[in-house]
């Protein structure tokens, strides 16, 4: 199959007009790879001035496209791109409009084309003077032989590149529901055969942005219900110990207690990611600590 571009960057955006220029400017820092990149800005029903803010970019660069659709949340944007066959790149990645890539990141990724998925480490922005180095895989740069080792808590869509064919094999995402980005990644792990990991930060995740789903309070009904749904679906995809870790988030656990709810899972979470016997010990400890809040068939 012939591709018009090496990369397609999907930028879902909802009322992030003040942040999206940094995301777009980071793509301009990709050197010769910028002109080989298709940028799809998908406005998911914003009520701010996002359209006016990105207009200078679309007017100056023919590879930056702007599209609008009714609001349906993050998953609906990915579905929209797939259903309309908009992506023309050999590899596809999703960049949230408040995140950004570091300079020459695409050059590092392109050096490892040929794999079904290419994943890199990234920074988490905490404050102007503080950021944290996050690794979605706890190993060195190279081919990942055991895909289960990718099932770590860092399931964000950032710095994850999917081969075009793999991207279109992924399950449709739920619309009008938070946290579908995590499901995209764990679903992809089940679909890919070959994964390459780059153990250096190639992007920055703005986790602390006011107003995003990460900073919303847990008593927000939409957030709480979406998190419950996420854990159940991640469990079906085989996310393993991550289910326990995500359940142990203080705010979520407190809300489970307040509502006197139990999370019903279709199966017991597998002891993935950590090496044996550490996985068994850690998984056992997490299972013990969450036994009042997680329920699954014993057989």
Swiss-Prot record:
KW Magnesium (keyword) present: no
Alphabetical keyword list: Glycosyltransferase, Transferase
Origin: domain of life: Bacteria
GO terms assigned for molecular function: hexosyltransferase activity
Its EC number(s): 2.4.-.-
Enzyme class: transferase
GO annotation, biological process: biosynthetic process
Pfam families referenced in this protein's UniProt entry, alphabetically: Glycos_transf_2 (PF00535)
Gene3D superfamilies reported in the protein's UniProt record: Spore Coat Polysaccharide Biosynthesis Protein SpsA, Chain A
Protein family: Belongs to the glycosyltransferase 2 family.
The name this protein goes by in its record: Uncharacterized glycosyltransferase MG025 homolog
The organism of origin for this protein: Mycoplasma pneumoniae (strain ATCC 29342 / M129 / Subtype 1) (Mycoplasmoides pneumoniae)
């Amino acid at each position: 199959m012939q591709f018009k571009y090496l990369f397609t960057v999907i930028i879902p955006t909802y009322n992030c007009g003040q942040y999206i220029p940094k995301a777009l400017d980071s793509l301009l820092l990709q050197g010769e790879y910028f002109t080989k990149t298709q940028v799809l800005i998908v406005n998911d029903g914003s009520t701010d001035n996002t359209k006016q803010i990105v207009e200078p970019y679309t007017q100056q660069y023919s590879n930056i496209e702007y599209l609008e659709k009714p609001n349906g949340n993050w998953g609906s944007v990915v579905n929209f791109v797939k259903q309309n066959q908009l992506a023309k790149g050999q590899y596809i990645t999703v960049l949230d409009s408040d995140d950004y890539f570091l300079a020459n990141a695409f050059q590092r990724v392109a050096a490892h084309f040929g794999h079904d998925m290419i994943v890199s480490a990234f920074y988490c922005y905490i404050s102007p003077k503080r950021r944290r180095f996050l690794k979605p895989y706890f190993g060195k740069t190279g081919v990942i032989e055991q895909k289960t080792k990718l099932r770590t808590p860092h399931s964000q869509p950032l710095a994850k590149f999917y081969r075009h064919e793999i991207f279109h094999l992924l399950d449709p995402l739920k619309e009008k529901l938070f946290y579908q980005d995590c499901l995209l990644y764990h679903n992809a792990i089940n679909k890919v055969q070959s994964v390459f990991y780059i153990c250096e930060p190639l992007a920055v995740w703005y986790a602390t942005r006011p107003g995003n789903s990460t900073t919303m309070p847990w008593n927000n009904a939409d957030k709480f219900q979406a998190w419950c749904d996420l854990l159940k679906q991640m469990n079906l995809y085989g996310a393993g110990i991550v289910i326990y870790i995500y359940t142990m988030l203080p705010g979520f656990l407190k809300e489970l207690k307040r509502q006197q709810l139990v999370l019903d899972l279709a199966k017991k979470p597998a002891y993935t990611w950590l090496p044996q016997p550490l996985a068994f010990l850690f998984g056992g400890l997490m299972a013990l600590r969450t036994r009042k809040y997680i329920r699954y068939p014993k057989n």
